[in-house]
């Protein structure tokens, strides 16, 4: 199927930029001196079993900040900004959010790394299993999961313009399988541009651990990061093959359950992986973004915009090998880039040139003029590795240290959250009373929808209970 032609059809073009975005971001809590926090998850956030925005991941100290689904990257980041304000002002005053993917100095004894104290006992047992199987230290690495969905209106228009597939849900699944394969093939570019875990703190790797020759571009996205064992192999040739392989891995005891399968891209349908045959793929989750320490949110708007155009490119461009070989080549290239020195020119310049040139051609063909500036900015970095995130980090680390970099930015962002203590980042144009109300609602875990910003009209929901609030009363 020629998606390039489909995307240029007159009826499709008005919809090409329509998409839905969501983001999950992990941060370790640390002391203001850069040591792992020893306190429990703050009780001020209420119960983790239902909180829509602030959870814990593997450990008791690892916050997970979750945005609601948004219709633009700007709207998603706006809410992420607000959640950060709430999180930073709610943790103990001698703590901060550690701004790096690699954790701060960890305790010498693994027993002192506390697994998240959750109400659901099966969730605790699962974390204990992960600790035993992969080690606690690898679980302490943090990153960003970027959720992306092509708008249903775009999918429908693409479907209407073709005749090969006769069911829209099947067509949507076909689209996402192609995009997932292309992402796995070309994800080396994301690792190159946004990799940000060049070094680890002393003691992160044990003496007997296999470990990289630091610095590298991204420990987290290399074989030294968190991943399944080598005998776990899953095909992306089709959704059926993907699910069959994972099911077989569970049956053979190579995975404890389906959710243990960990990959740079995850196919999402319902709540469980087993829902996928019924729901089809609704969106995909990109799991290979390191935290950008040069942003108080761990990610900047240009990166979100670039990822949006990159997702369009992955639909636009053809696959050039059989599915499994295509993905395998991507694994090899990604490892090569992840293990490279942050200031070293990569060997994939020619392929990088092709990707960027084709992205610019695509933006021209689809009339997306505003995208060329963002794509051009990152194209400049292809031959200037010192300008990438890991490149800039290494420049600082050489003169100082990794922990100093984390301390400086972590403390700076923590202080910034208190500069306007009665205002809420992302919503500062609203009335002060509404901002204070929103802060409390986010902190306590009420789902929020802004129905009319001019009128200060909000919808709050907890479970089945709904309240409408105007002017914060």
Predicted regions and their residues:
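Short, glycine/acidic-rich hinge or "gate" loops at secondary-structure transitions
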Residues: 96-109, 159-164, 323-330
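Flexible loop/turn segments at secondary-structure boundaries
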Residues: 35-36, 106-107, 155, 292-296
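Terminal catalytic/cofactor-binding subdomain
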Residues: 1-131, 138-142
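Long, well-ordered alpha-helical scaffolding segments within enzyme catalytic domains
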Residues: 78-92, 158-195, 298-322
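Long, well-ordered mid-to-C-terminal structural blocks that present hydrophobic/aromatic surfaces
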Residues: 251-353
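Loop-rich catalytic cores of soluble enzymes, especially ATP-dependent carboxylate-amine ligases
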Residues: 8-9, 105, 117-136, 140, ...
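Sequence termini and other peripheral, non-core segments
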Residues: 1-54, 325, 329-473
């Amino acid at each position: 199927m020629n998606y390039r032609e489909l995307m240029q059809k007159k009826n499709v073009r008005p919809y090409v930029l329509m998409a839905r975005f969501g983001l999950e971001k992990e941060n370790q809590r640390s002391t203001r001196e850069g040591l792992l926090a020893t306190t429990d998850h703050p009780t001020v956030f209420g119960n983790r079993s239902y909180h829509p925005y602030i959870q814990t991941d593997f450990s008791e100290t690892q916050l997970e900040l979750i945005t609601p689904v948004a219709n633009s990257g700007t709207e998603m980041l706006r809410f992420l900004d607000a959640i950060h304000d709430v999180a930073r002002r709610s943790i103990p005053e001698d703590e901060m959010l550690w701004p790096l993917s690699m954790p701060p100095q960890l305790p010498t004894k693994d027993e002192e790394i506390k697994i998240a104290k959750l109400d659901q006992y099966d969730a605790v047992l699962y974390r204990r299993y992960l600790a035993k199987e992969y080690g606690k230290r690898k679980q302490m690495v943090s990153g960003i999961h970027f959720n992306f969905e092509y708008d249903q209106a775009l999918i429908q228009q693409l479907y209407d313009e073709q005749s090969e597939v006769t069911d829209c849900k099947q067509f949507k699944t076909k689209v996402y399988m192609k995009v997932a394969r292309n992402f796995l093939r070309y994800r080396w570019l994301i690792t190159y541009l946004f990799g940000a875990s060049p070094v680890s703190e002393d003691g992160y790797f044990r003496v007997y651990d296999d470990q990289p020759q630091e610095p590298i571009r991204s420990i987290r996205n290399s074989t030294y990061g968190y991943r399944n064992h080598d005998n776990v192999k899953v095909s992306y040739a089709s959704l059926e093959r993907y699910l069959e392989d994972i099911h077989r891995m569970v049956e053979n005891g190579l995975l404890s359950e389906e959710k243990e399968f960990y990959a740079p891209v995850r196919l999402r349908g319902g709540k469980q992986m087993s829902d996928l045959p019924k729901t089809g793929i609704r969106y995909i989750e990109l799991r290979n973004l390191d935290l950008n320490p040069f942003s108080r949110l761990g990610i900047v708007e240009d990166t979100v915009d670039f990822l949006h155009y990159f997702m369009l490119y992955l639909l636009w461009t053809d696959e050039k090998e059989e599915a499994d070989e295509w993905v395998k080549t991507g694994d090899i290239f990604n490892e090569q880039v992840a293990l490279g020195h942050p200031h070293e020119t990569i060997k994939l310049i020619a392929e990088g040139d092709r990707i960027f040139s084709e992205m610019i051609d695509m933006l021209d063909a689809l009339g997306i003029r505003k995208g060329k500036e963002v794509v051009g900015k990152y194209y400049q970095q292809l031959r200037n590795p010192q300008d990438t995130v890991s490149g800039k980090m290494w420049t600082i680390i050489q003169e100082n240290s990794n922990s100093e970099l984390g301390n400086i930015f972590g403390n700076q962002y923590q202080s910034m959250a208190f500069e306007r203590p009665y205002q809420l980042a992302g919503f500062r144009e609203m009335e002060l009373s509404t901002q204070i109300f929103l802060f409390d609602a986010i902190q306590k875990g009420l789902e929020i929808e802004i129905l009319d910003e001019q009128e200060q009209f909000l919808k709050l929901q907890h479970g089945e209970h709904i309240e409408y609030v105007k002017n914060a009363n």
